[in-house]
Amino acid sequence: MSFYTKDYSKRMTLIAEEGGAQLYEYLPSAFKLLAINFEKPRFVRRMRFLLEYLHRGHYKVYYLAVDGEFVGHCVVTPGGRRLSVSTKKDIVLGPYFVSPEHRGKGYAKVIVRMTLEYCTYDYECAYDWIHDDNYASIKTSEACGMVKEGTRLNVVGLMRKLVPSENGDNIVYKYVRK
């Protein structure tokens, strides 16, 4: 099930096509933080996106459509903010999400790979952090050329701050742009 906003097309641009897959870039506004929600957004996630939009500059959301149907999204934020190992020359991926009815078809790999290749940020490295028991996301990131960076994180507090920790249960992955 998708939770669509009334009119997202004004802020969404087609940026790449490969076969039957299309990658769209969405520029959020304070009132439309996501164009399409594939899951009912939790309050904390909405607040994090709103704070990112208001206080830290803009983030972008990349939507994957396959044969004209939206199947998932990948949020991209500038680096040097929430994830301490990133710099202002980097980007941070996540969350990325594929709707339940489209899982198991390789779309997560497609959206991450296309986002890394076609996103409009000028970046040197891309980072992602993944809970160490999220094997599907680990496999997706590694298949897209991301490697373990070595840093482990804990996600703490209401706003889910990322804190480096030797015993952290999240693994940081890094992709170096070619």
Language model region names:
Residues 1-47:
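Acyl-donor-binding surface of acyltransferase catalytic domains
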Residues 41-96:
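A conserved beta-strand-loop-helix scaffold within acyl/acetyltransferase catalytic domains
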Residues 95-98, 104-118, 139-143:
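Conserved acetyl-CoA-binding loop-helix of GNAT-fold acetyltransferases
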Residues 2-3, 147-162:
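Conserved catalytic-core motifs of GNAT/GCN5-like acyltransferases
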Residues 119-130:
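Conserved GNAT acetyl-CoA-binding A-motif
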Residues 99, 131:
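Residue-level recognition of the GNAT/N-acetyltransferase active site
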Residues 132-150:
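Conserved active-site alpha-helix within GNAT-family acetyltransferase domains
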